[in-house]
Every structure is written in C-alpha cells, then in structure tokens.
C-alpha cells in the first residue's frame, strides 16, 4: 500500500510564462482556483477547452476534480468533464460550457474553475450473474421524490 504524508507538497509546472499558480482564496476553501492562460470567447450554447498551461503530479491516493466556481455558475457557465487522473502529466485544460444567453469572454488570468483533490479507491471488480435486491431496486432519476 502506498503511504503518503498528508503534508507532502503537490508538484506542478508552469508550462509557459502565461500560466498562473493555482491558489486558495481562503484558509477554508476546498479547492485551488485555476486560471486561464489565454483569452477566449464562448458563444451561447457552445463549449471551449480553456488551457491553464499548468501540469502537475497528483498524489497516488488522489485524483483531481475540476469543479465549477459558484460565481461563474450564476452566469450560466458550467464545467464539462473534470477528472484529472493521478498518472496524467499534461497541460490541465478546463471545458467551459456557456449555458447562458450572452457571449462569455474569458480573459488571460481569469479564475475559471477550482481543483479539488479527492481520495480515490481502486476496488477489484467482480462480474456476477445478479445483484442483491433492495427496496429501491432499479428506480432512479428522481424516484425518491423532492422532499
């Protein structure tokens, strides 16, 4: 089993001088803000891969989850995808989706998403002929109600 000191730093590289180091905006912030390295224009209903020009080495016990920033979500901007595997070493890109009605401009240095480190578990998978039954069964997609 891999043992890692919880205080071990996560190494990252600025691939260009346009890259900005990930930052936490408060001591209690769950995520590190990621910054756009370039200018982009995203029309309504479209999506764009935003480059950060940052690459990093994830701890073996974690993966990186790219999550939306609440201020951008309020403007109709969402995240597509959002998993950085622990063995990925390339430029971290963020897929922004413009669900709003207006064109959205991303400027160099804008905070575009947050990176949250989450522990990961790699279970052994076992194929079986059937699963144990539960009261819920195969009912999903809102079947438990709103309240």
Curated annotation (Swiss-Prot):
Keywords: Early protein, Hydrolase, Magnesium, Metal-binding, Nucleotide metabolism. GO terms for molecular function: dUTP diphosphatase activity; magnesium ion binding. DUTP binds at residues 68-70, 82-85, 88, 93, 95, 111. Its cofactor is Mg(2+). Induction: Expressed in the early phase of the viral replicative cycle. Pfam families: dUTPase. Mg(2+) binds at residue 24. It is an enzyme of class 3 (hydrolase). Signal peptide: none annotated. Its EC number is 3.6.1.23. Belongs to the dUTPase family. This enzyme is involved in nucleotide metabolism: it produces dUMP, the immediate precursor of thymidine nucleotides and it decreases the intracellular concentration of dUTP so that uracil cannot be incorporated into DNA. NCBIfam families: dut, PRK00601.1. This is Deoxyuridine 5'-triphosphate nucleotidohydrolase. It comes from Vaccinia virus (strain Copenhagen) (VACV).
């Amino acid at each position: 089993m891999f043992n890692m000191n919880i205080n071990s730093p996560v190494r990252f590289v600025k691939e260009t001088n346009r890259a900005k180091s990930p930052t936490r905006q408060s001591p209690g912030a769950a995520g590190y803000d990621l910054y756009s390295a370039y200018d982009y224009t995203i029309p309504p209903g479209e999506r764009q891969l935003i480059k950060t020009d940052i690459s990093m080495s994830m701890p073996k016990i974690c993966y990186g989850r790219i999550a939306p920033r609440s201020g951008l979500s309020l403007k109709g901007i969402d995240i597509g995808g959002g998993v950085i595997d622990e063995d990925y070493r390339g430029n971290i890109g963020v897929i922004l989706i413009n669900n709003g009605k207006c064109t959205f401009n991303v400027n160099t240095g804008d905070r575009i998403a947050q990176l949250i480190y989450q522990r990961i578990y790699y279970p052994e998978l076992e194929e079986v002929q059937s699963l144990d039954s539960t009261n819920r069964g195969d009912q999903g997609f809102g079947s438990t109600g709103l309240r």
